[in-house]
Amino acid sequence: MKLFGVSGDRDKFRKLTSHPQQVLGCELFESLDGDMRGQRMLRIRNGEIEIEVLVDRGFDIGRVLYQGIPTQWVSPAGFRHAHTFTPSAIEPDGWGWLRTWQGGFLSTIGIDHVGGPKSTPNRHLHPGITAERRFTGGFISLSPTTIEKVDVNWEKGTIEVIAKVRQAAAFAEHLVLTRKISMNFGESTFKLSDFIQ
């Protein structure tokens, strides 16, 4: 493999670095200021590629840097914590999601509604609710995440993170998205898989 202009295997790179985290690692951190205040993020580093996972935004992928170059688009709203979103207070017509949509490398849409705002017949189990208004984008990217696994294995040269995102409401849906992101040392790619229950 070739990394930062140097050819070699994992053992060679181990000798060239004082700590494996220089080229292979994963850190959980939290933003302390501005619109992102309180947002937890995972920064995953694998040689020449680095990704930033927005833990409290449905485990979406915010930034992806390849050789230090950003590959994502960021909306004019910028990166924001989901708690800044109040759809009924900001945009009563259902488009308020766009005020907090950060763009990024991957924004999860749905998982039970995609497209623009609309009203649907009741699917709640509560007799007092006769219709439901769905807003643009759905709820999942506004949902916090439970991190199930973070495994950085220098011996195998792998990184794997698994998280669960739950979208639920009383008398309504209870959906769980399990997202896995994995990388192999020295490869400039990552794999993402989703499973919905």
Model region roles, listed by residue range:
Residues 1-191:
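Surface-exposed acidic/polar loop and edge beta-strand patches at domain peripheries
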Residues 193-197:
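A conserved active-site cap/scaffold subdomain adjacent to cofactor or substrate pockets
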